[in-house]
Amino acid sequence: MLDIIKQIESQYIRTDLPNFNIGDTVKVHVRIKEGNRQRVQVFEGIVLKRQNGGVRETFTVRRVAYGVGVERTFPVNAPIIEKIQVVRRGKVRRAKLYYLRDRVGKAAKVKEILK
């Protein structure tokens, strides 16, 4: 039974997206439909968490816009995501970065992995 589910789900898993981890700064290009028009909106921020796996995998991106923290959760395999760009690789020691919600300014920064 599980093999059948995995086989069906494998058809919907996207392979065109880059590998990104928690703590990375990413630009998510989201397709938005307004009436009969479509446009692409870019949401840039730090990846706070990744949840689940397979087709149901989601990730949450946080940014501070005009002094207000904004978090958006995206399904990884959703067709509304046009592309994901990794801007910076972050070095973190946690799987969930909820502590960044309480931090302001430089304290909310994540160390960058230098190549």
Swiss-Prot record:
InterPro entries the record matches: Ribosomal_bL19 (IPR001857), Ribosomal_bL19_CS (IPR018257), Ribosomal_bL19_sf (IPR038657), Translation_prot_SH3-like_sf (IPR008991)
PROSITE patterns: RIBOSOMAL_L19
Keyword Secreted assigned: no
SUPFAM superfamilies linked: Translation proteins SH3-like domain (SSF50104)
Keywords per UniProt: Ribonucleoprotein, Ribosomal protein
Taxonomic superkingdom: Bacteria
GO CC terms, sorted: cytosolic large ribosomal subunit
GO MF annotation list: structural constituent of ribosome
GO biological process: translation
Pfam families per the UniProt record, alphabetical: Ribosomal_L19
PANTHER family assigned to the protein according to its UniProt record, in alphabetical order: LARGE RIBOSOMAL SUBUNIT PROTEIN BL19M, RIBOSOMAL PROTEIN L19
Family: Belongs to the bacterial ribosomal protein bL19 family.
Primary role: This protein is located at the 30S-50S ribosomal subunit interface and may play a role in the structure and function of the aminoacyl-tRNA binding site.
UniProt protein name: Large ribosomal subunit protein bL19
Native source species: Clostridium kluyveri (strain ATCC 8527 / DSM 555 / NBRC 12016 / NCIMB 10680 / K1)
Gene: rplS
